């Protein structure tokens, strides 16, 4: 693999994206273009597989694969999807950048809370926000979990760190759970969540930046499917400002997790009441949600100004 940055110049703002050959999402490309326009040569985009981290002579170090030493940026815009992050890989890289003095947006603590759906629900519930009743486990055998008297059906079954609607299905009754328990992947736990029938096949996604709702979209599934994700063939309709109570709830959910940038998925418990389904620390957005990219660009510029003014942030 060749070094994609043979003579990198010091950059104040980085965008960190997943390893190659993964294709960048359209929204990530849009944001990268905006950041390049705002910061010029002081902006750089790095893939996680382009960087080497280390310790030399008692100091933390950062290099390209080609051996070129790098100064840490002041601000890192994290666009690596939180769910699939590996604790010993991407998270270790983020921690290294944080310990070298870079400001991560979102912060490492917020990324960790967002990457696990149970961690999210713990924080949201403790903040007094509405969430569906949920059951999960640590090391209990899955065959025993699905026979627990505390597990009620119908329920939605999800991997605790799934993304884009993957590994999500509706279990209408206990027999299906008993039948599939032996064939479900065991790498990560599952959660079993109350099925919100009023919202079946519908999810309201609100993008929150720096404590303000900057875009909202209604996702609707195909036919009678449960998951409304675009990745699963769902449709999307912009609805910014049409559900103010939902947007307020999304702001509170992002705040509870410490997220400056968030995509909050809400379910309808009635035509005008909502519960928090889950929160995404690296949200995507549609081209017609034109306020999102300028809001994130301004958010990162604000973090850059604060980092530059902080004498304790040294490089």
Language model segments and positions:
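Protein kinase-like catalytic core scaffold
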Residues: 155, 214-215, 262, 275-278
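Conserved N-proximal alpha/beta basic substrate-recognition cap immediately N-terminal to
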Residues: 20-133
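ATP-grasp fold ATP-binding core
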Residues: 124-125, 149-166, 188-199
